Amino acid sequence: MKRFFPFVAFWFSMTVLSAQSAIERVIEIRHAYAEAQTMMLHAIEEPNMDNSMHIEMRRMFGGTGMQHYTIDYFSGDFSEEEPMEGVFVWSPYFSRVKYNCAARVTVTEYLIEPRTGALMFVYTKSDDHPLDFSEIGEGVYELRKYYYSDGTYCTGSLKVTLPDGSEKSLDEELNAKIHPFDADADENNYVRYLISIHNHMMNNE
């Protein structure tokens, strides 16, 4: 567990930064994402570690058939005991949600500041067009959204790989469509929901 300490210091430093440019924030988040990937590899390689969780859910809908969700969580030594006896709060630093429905697959990754639960970064890869980009048509969409340390929207990028293999950047169109306040509310509310599921499961083992 000692290897977590440098990582904790790294994350903590992320929360005390003053105002910064979008470029600086993007660079910072990319470093944090790389750190998270390293931590996840450690968690996966060590079967006795108790800081990861895998949840699967299936439900049938008449119109679209079977919907299949998988949610993975990775958290370090960040648990805090609540005033209620025996109730603990864990703050995952990373969550991955995979959604499969009607032969379409969407995978979304959430990078989370574990001390505060604030959203840092969202990456979505999907066979379906996000944010109503239906005019582009079929393709594989990769959406990235970056957030400041207080959880407010910073910037984003969107790339689509078309069936012929060509790529198209939709960065300007994406940032024109996204209203920062809506982005803040939608994504941060969903991350809080994911964390609540995680903590419910951890406290009901």
What do these predicted ranges mean?
Residues 4-15:
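Sec-dependent N-terminal signal peptides
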Residues 21-205:
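Buried hydrophobic residues that stabilize the cores of well-folded domains
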